[in-house]
A protein has these predicted regions:
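Short acidic, glycine-rich surface-loop motifs adjacent to enzyme active sites
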Residues: 149-161
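Buried hydrophobic positions in well-ordered alpha/beta secondary-structure cores of metabolic enzymes
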Residues: 65, 74, 91, 112, ...
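Conserved N-terminal subdomain of the carbohydrate kinase-like
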Residues: 13-16, 24-151, 306-319
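Conserved phosphate/ATP/ADP-binding segment of small-molecule kinases
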Residues: 159-250
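Conserved post-catalytic alpha-helical subdomain immediately downstream of the catalytic base
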Residues: 231-232, 256-316
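A short, aliphatic-rich alpha-helical micro-motif
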Residues: 11, 146-147, 188-192
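Active-site metal-binding loops of divalent metal-dependent hydrolases
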Residues: 22, 157, 269
């Protein structure tokens, strides 16, 4: 029996709180047959019968955790609008307990992708930052909601929903909670004291600069980990897999993807799977290995998607 097998019957013990920037991912599908006479751009004739809506950002993290069988709550801010209501419907259908503060001053973030000729032609983003008052209300709710949760996932998409993330980490760690952070931007001091921070390769380069060798990367990653006072730094590296940096230790997981169709949302799947496995009692290094497998599965799907337990078990059995 592989070490991860016995934990699959324990996934319901993972009680996850996801906090962060949510959005609605919309996909319009069509055909491309000609170039516009108005500008050198393709014309996409939309098939009105082919469209898709999925929760994105922190909502996608919550969806992935729920799909694995965890007990999941989501805390975020949306606008008082149709996309916000649609998000709430989709989350409820997936079994996520969503606590969405409605801010009439903002629009729910929507990412509209137009797909033609089997590829994404372009993306249109609709977004505004939430108000200070709503964010303070969310911070107060956070203090109450973490009581019965064993893992907190903070999903930062840089949309303003995690303005008080430093306070959230401080409160959660004071209560002994495992805190995972999917970071954004170049100011990682806000994540000080978290348990694990999970930047991708590009995000890490923004903070520590480029590296020319594995030894240089290790030195930079360990220096950042120590500076932030986090237990571990998990760097996702696309085709190069992912690397975990702990105190006096580096461990690497090679990439598992057989085919890559779409990398959007892969980081959400990785941190969600990591959180669920830790919440079920799995040791960190084993949880990273499982999360790596989940990431390899989801990049083989088009658009933001989730990984089902049977898919994950199958991939682990074949590894």
């Amino acid at each position: 029996m592989k070490p991860e097998d016995r934990f699959f019957s324990e996934l319901h013990k993972a009680k996850i709180l996801v906090v962060g920037d949510v959005m609605l991912d919309r996909y319009w599908y069509g055909e491309v047959n000609r170039i516009s006479p108005e500008a050198p751009v393709p014309i996409v004739k939309i098939d009105t019968g082919r469209s898709k809506e999925t929760p994105g950002g922190a909502a996608n993290v919550a969806m992935n955790a729920a799909a694995l069988g965890a007990n999941v709550a989501l805390l975020s801010v949306v606008g008082d609008d149709e996309p916000g209501r649609r998000l709430a419907e989709l989350l409820e259908k997936a079994g996520v307990s969503a606590y969405l503060h409605r801010d009439a001053e903002v629009s729910t973030t929507v990412k509209l992708r137009v797909i033609g000729a089997h590829q994404q032609m372009f993306r249109v983003d609709f977004e505004t930052a939430p108000s200070h008052e709503v964010l303070l209300d969310k911070l107060a709710d956070f203090g109450h909601m973490i009581a019965d949760r064993n893992v907190i996932i903070l999903s930062d998409y840089g949309k303003g929903g995690l303005t008080h993330i430093a306070s959230m980490i401080e409160v959660a760690r004071a209560r002994g909670k495992t805190v995972l952070v999917d970071p954004k931007g170049d100011d990682y001091s806000r994540y000080r004291g978290a348990t694990v921070v999970t930047p991708n390769r590009s995000e890490l380069q923004t903070v520590v600069g480029r590296w020319k060798s594995e030894d240089e990367l290790t030195a930079k990653a360990q220096a950042l980990r120590e500076k932030l006072g986090v237990a571990a730094l998990l760097v996702t590296r696309s085709e190069d897999g992912m690397t975990l940096y702990e105190k006096d230790r580096r461990s690497h997981e090679p990439a598992r993807a057989r085919e890559v169709f779409d990398v959007s949302g892969a980081g959400d799947t990785v941190i969600a799977t990591l959180g669920v496995m830790l919440g079920a009692g799995m040791p960190l290094r084993d949880a990273v290995s499982v999360a790596n497998q989940a990431g390899g599965i989801v990049v083989g799907k088009l658009g933001t998607a989730v990984v089902q337990p049977e898919e994950l078990r199958g991939a682990l059995a074949a590894a």
